[in-house]
Amino acid sequence: MKKYLLYLAQSHPNFRKAELESLADLYGIKVDLSNHNENSPFMIVQLENDEQAKKLVKRAVLAKAIYELWGHGDDLEKMHEDVKRNKDKLVGRFKKSRFKFVILQYQGKKKTRKQQTKIMDSFQYLGLEGKIDLENPEEKFTVLETYTIQKSNLEPRPEPDHCWFGRLVQLSVRSDGIVDKYEIAKRPYYGTTTFESELSLVTCNLAQVRDGAFIYDPFVGTGSFLLASAYFGGYAFGSDIDFLTLKGGRPGKKNIKNLEDDFEYYGTHDKFGDVICMDFTNCALRKDMKIDTIVCDPPYGIREGVKVCGTTNMASAELTKTTLIEGQHVFLRKDYVQPKKSVSLDFMLDDLLQFAADRLPVGGRLCFWMPAANDADIPTLIPQHQRLELIHTLVQQFNKWSRRLLVYVKRDEHYNGKTVTREERAHKNNFRERYFSQFS
């Protein structure tokens, strides 16, 4: 086993470990991530080789890079001592490679050219014989430093808290600009409830979306999860009860943009299967239709309530059954708009878990977001199903509420997990009511 240094993003740090665990599991990599610290962007791990390191980090959204670790210490001097102990077994393969040095600081001030040159010159004992190539090096030897911000003046301490030296093995998609590329405002089509780009991509990694997999979002909206799925190679399919959201506006309106335009914009149109207008609680998909992965953000009921087909006005419903237009029952006409009624989110989630238990293959994943009130005295009960193992509960905090990303894995018939139905959750999980009453 070899030591590697992970350089992580300080964005959503409580999601980082779970994302790496999911990617490690996807590629069959055994790695101990128990040293993960949410307050630090650096973590040392042990892997068998560079190929494992590349697979672990390449598509990670909350990691920046991974380095073959050559040495580290509490200051530059101690770091050099450690590198000198290891150099004989590390330098040989790269002695004649074209190279460059990179110096990175976390929370520290960028060093002057003179300071950088001094640090680079201090590595002459490595005996590197290759040419320095700043444009297209074969190897990038990197010094990474972390600093503490002083409370007195909010400036970094003059000296680093710790230093690492390593050889760059792999940059992540984050370092290649994927989060910025999928920024909502850059898309041809988006809406008020469009899910943020960064966590859409993270969610798809936790769902283990892979090349050629069938991905389904039953509450597709403006399609953030499908776009992210297509980026990772999945075939994207979805449904939504809102026809206008799927089509981008009313028929006949000029210059309408819709989800398909976003796929064209990102060059992933070949991964776009289709989206259909459907009430998920009255699913029109075949019973034997298998789905590899389900990723979604069910309607919470803050900006948009939870709607299903139906009506609470029984008199109107009876009238609809008998009304004819041009000799045709009104509910059979193409221009008929199905009435909708509100239901609780818990009602929807039970259907979602049962759907996943029926349709996913063993090992397939269901990932969805669920809101919760930030009430210390009232815990939120998480939906459970006996065939689905809940492996991650990840929280994104807001002011008076939070949302949780729940990650389930479908297990075989021998697994008999816990079931928590909507009847058990209903009293504690009435999120919409508590949100608009300020959780009082």
Model-derived features: positions:
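A short N-terminal interaction module
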Residues: 88-152, 156, 163
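A broadly used, surface-exposed interaction patch
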Residues: 58, 62-88
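A short, well-structured beta->alpha microelement
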Residues: 29-30, 82, 130-133
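Short amphipathic alpha-helix with an adjacent loop that forms part of the alpha/beta core around
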Residues: 82-93, 283-290
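Residues that form generic nucleotide/phosphate-binding pockets
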Residues: 23, 79-89, 122, 126, ...
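Class I S-adenosyl-L-methionine-dependent methyltransferase catalytic core
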Residues: 1-60, 65, 78, 107-110, ...
